[in-house]
């Protein structure tokens, strides 16, 4: 496995690459969810590139940038064992300059749900993903469905900026008890982790209601909020694949989303129906 930190060096290294490139951008603290992305990339491409970059521009003031889990050596070993060809490990000053050009998230889709409570978050996400895609120039880039709003906005960016990359969505990986894997799970105390299971339980209950023929969003959301109590709920929402709120679930075109906090730890989860 080759490790590169300089963006220009990586661009030069890949400049004449004829093999198909699969790319997985991460912020490190890799887990089974990231491994699933790597495996999918290896199935579909001849060369796999993983980036590890804790992007400061997607964190708001007072958020967990400084305490975000850092496991650099473990991450290197995971990538090596998974057969990653290139690990891109850039520094902040290699990605961002003093006179920075940034992307702005769409006025509607980028500022609802997670974007409402974190108003500049998706500006930072889109900017760094755009930079990374321009450096690596992959055929395909891989993102988890757990971060559904992020996935939607990145797909929209790629489409509207006429970028030649396929965005591949990979199913959420869960613990045996249903908790969606997240690097932030490391923050949870044992008691908080037990409480966090209410998130997956609420989504299973919503799915069961739909299977019984209950499609009314208001009824489903009310039931989910009851299950989630007393968690600190940022939002429970039912949207279509364009992230417009739905009054009724549309099978094949719906995402049910939850964001809730336990202490200072925010957890996201969703189900695609």
Curated annotation (Swiss-Prot):
Reactions catalysed: (R)-pantoate + beta-alanine + ATP = (R)-pantothenate + AMP + diphosphate + H(+)
Places the protein is found: Cytoplasm
Highest taxon listed in the record's lineage: Bacteria
One Pfam family recorded for the sequence: Pantoate_ligase
Enzyme class per UniProt: ligase
Signal peptide location: none
Keywords: ATP-binding, Cytoplasm, Ligase, Nucleotide-binding, Pantothenate biosynthesis
Similarity comment text for this entry: Belongs to the pantothenate synthetase family.
Protein name, entry field: Pantothenate synthetase
């Amino acid at each position: 496995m080759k490790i590169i930190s300089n963006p220009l060096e990586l661009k030069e290294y890949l400049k004449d690459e004829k093999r198909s490139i699969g790319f997985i951008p991460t912020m490190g603290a890799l887990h089974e969810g990231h491994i699933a992305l790597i495996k999918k990339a290896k199935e579909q491409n001849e060369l796999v590139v993983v980036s590890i970059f804790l992007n400061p521009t997607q964190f708001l003031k007072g958020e967990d940038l400084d305490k975000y889990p850092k496991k650099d050596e473990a991450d290197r070993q995971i990538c090596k064992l998974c057969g990653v060809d290139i690990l891109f490990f850039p520094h902040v000053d290699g990605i961002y300059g003093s006179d920075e050009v940034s992307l702005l998230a769409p006025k509607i889709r980028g500022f609802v749900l997670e974007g409402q409570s974190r108003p500049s978050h998706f500006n930072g996400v889109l900017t760094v993903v755009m930079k990374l895609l321009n450096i690596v120039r992959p055929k395909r880039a891989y993102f988890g469905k757990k971060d559904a709003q992020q996935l939607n906005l990145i797909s929209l960016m790629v489409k509207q900026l006429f970028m030649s990359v396929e965005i591949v969505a990979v199913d959420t990986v869960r613990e045996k008890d249903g908790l969606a894997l997240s690097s932030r799970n490391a923050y949870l105390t044992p008691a908080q982790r037990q409480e966090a299971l209410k998130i997956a339980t609420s989504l299973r209950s919503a799915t069961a209601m739909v299977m019984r023929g209950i499609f009314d969003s208001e009824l489903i959301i009310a039931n989910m909020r009851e299950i989630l109590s007393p968690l600190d709920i940022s939002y429970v929402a039912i949207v279509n694949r364009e992230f417009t709120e739905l009054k009724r679930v549309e099978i094949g075109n719906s995402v049910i989303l939850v964001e809730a906090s336990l202490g200072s730890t925010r957890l996201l989860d969703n189900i695609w129906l």
